[in-house]
């Protein structure tokens, strides 16, 4: 396997899999251009509402851009929405030290085209990932899965950073569980206006978080280790969608304000 910290050393690729924190992607788009050829597919495995969400969505919101996840249209213009293949990353992991990834649980990477088609490129990367021992189904309604995962990221991440607490605690505590529930219900109201169908209910989603155990969310890890916190894509984007769909988000607004202040106080957020 060839590796380099300079994309120009590698040249155009068939697939470029992007798994950075959402706020880290726009600044590196210019540096990734040597990897992108005429037929390159960008597999976007980034948490939060994806920058391409309204590409080929088939509604009157077609082409809507989200400033919270793609400031200045860096990805929309630099990658191009037609190149993108969506991906929902399920494994839980921690970074105990630079260069070391500790896998906690999970091996599923759901894939999906923005228009829901089972394209040749989606099936090809699915086959390659499956051959490596991973679960990589191609979904016709990937946005549904995006929201089910976002339910957790939207609520568990900021609450864990504010508390601070691990998943097993915040999902069962009599004070924080209702906060997570209210945030999820507000998000569900937004998503359903956008045509999303949830395969599970909020209580089951929270129970699923508790079942992961004493896991420290990525936002809590970032806070503890002094890294910039992924607030805009996980929480701010849902607030932005609330404004787009004219949906009230009082609990999300409150938790977002507190989380931003906590992060600013630690020097980990400048928005």
Task: For each feature predicted by the language model, list its residue ranges.
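NAD(P)-dependent Rossmann-like dehydrogenase/reductase catalytic/cofactor-binding core
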Residues: 169, 177-271
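Alpha-helix N-cap/loop-to-helix initiation residues
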Residues: 24-25, 118, 227, 248
């Amino acid at each position: 396997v060839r590796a380099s910290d300079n994309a120009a050393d590698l040249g155009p690729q068939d697939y470029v899999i992007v798994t950075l924190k959402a706020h880290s992607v726009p600044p590196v788009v210019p540096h990734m251009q040597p990897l992108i050829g005429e037929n390159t597919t960008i597999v976007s495995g980034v948490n939060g509402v994806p920058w391409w969400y309204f590409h080929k969505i088939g509604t009157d919101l077609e082409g809507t851009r989200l400033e919270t996840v793609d400031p200045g249209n860096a990805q929309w213009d630099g990658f191009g929405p037609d190149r993108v293949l969506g991906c929902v990353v399920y494994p839980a992991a921690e970074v105990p030290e630079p260069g070391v990834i500790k896998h906690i649980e999970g091996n599923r990477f759901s894939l999906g085209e923005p228009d829901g088609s089972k394209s040749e490129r989606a099936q090809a990367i699915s086959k390659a990932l499956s051959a490596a021992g991973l679960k990589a189904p191609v979904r016709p309604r990937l946005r549904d899965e995006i929201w089910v995962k976002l339910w957790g990221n939207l609520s568990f991440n900021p609450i864990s950073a504010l508390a601070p607490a691990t998943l097993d605690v915040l999902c069962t505590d009599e004070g924080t569980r209702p906060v997570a529930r209210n945030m999820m219900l507000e998000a569900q109201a937004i998503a359903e206006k956008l045509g999303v169908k949830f395969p599970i209910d909020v209580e089951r989603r929270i129970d699923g978080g508790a079942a992961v155990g004493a896991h420290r969310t990525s936002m809590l890890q970032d806070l503890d280790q002094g890294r910039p916190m992924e607030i805009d894509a996980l929480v701010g984007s849902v607030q932005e969608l609330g404004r787009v769909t004219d949906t009230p988000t009082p609990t999300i607004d409150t938790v977002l304000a507190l989380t931003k202040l906590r992060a600013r106080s630690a020097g980990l957020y400048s928005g």
